[in-house]
């Protein structure tokens, strides 16, 4: 699971309870990176998933922001390939677009389709 996250984290827990991910990676802005490093440690123990990476984008509101989001997404995928379990078929990739900015949601949707995953949005935590 890859979650695009902004300042509010409640929807992340709803995502874990609905999809029971093997692992979780978070993409956020530099403003929230430290917060999600701590929360991902806590959540991985509480919800029994493998802790992934917290990738952050420093140029979120600049013209290069989308390129940085793409790089962060592929950093998470690469980490998953290097550290995930060996299997005969890849797991279904869930990409959460509830948090963050509109261009994070659009980029996440596009990348989920390219990677063969599915996109979800949490209406209410």
Predicted regions and their residues:
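Short histidine/acidic/glycine/proline-rich micro-motifs that form metal-
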Residues: 30, 98-99
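Conformationally flexible catalytic loops at phosphate/diphosphate-handling active centers
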Residues: 95
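Long, low-complexity, Lys/Arg-enriched
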Residues: 1-92, 106-125
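Short glycine-rich anion-binding loops that position phosphate/pyrophosphate groups of nucleotides
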Residues: 7-8, 99-101
């Amino acid at each position: 699971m890859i979650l695009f996250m902004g300042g509010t984290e409640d929807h992340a827990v709803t995502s874990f309870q609905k999809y029971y991910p093997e692992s979780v990676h978070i993409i956020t802005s530099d403003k929230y990176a430290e917060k999600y490093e701590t929360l991902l440690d806590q959540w991985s123990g509480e919800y029994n998933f493998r802790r992934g990476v917290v990738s952050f984008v420093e140029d979120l509101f600049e013209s290069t922001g989308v390129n940085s989001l793409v790089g962060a997404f592929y950093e998470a995928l690469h980490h998953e390939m290097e550290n995930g379990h060996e299997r005969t078929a890849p797991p279904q990739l869930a990409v959460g677009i509830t948090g963050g900015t509109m261009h994070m949601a659009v980029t996440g949707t596009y990348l989920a389709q390219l990677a063969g995953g599915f996109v979800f949005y949490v209406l209410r935590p």
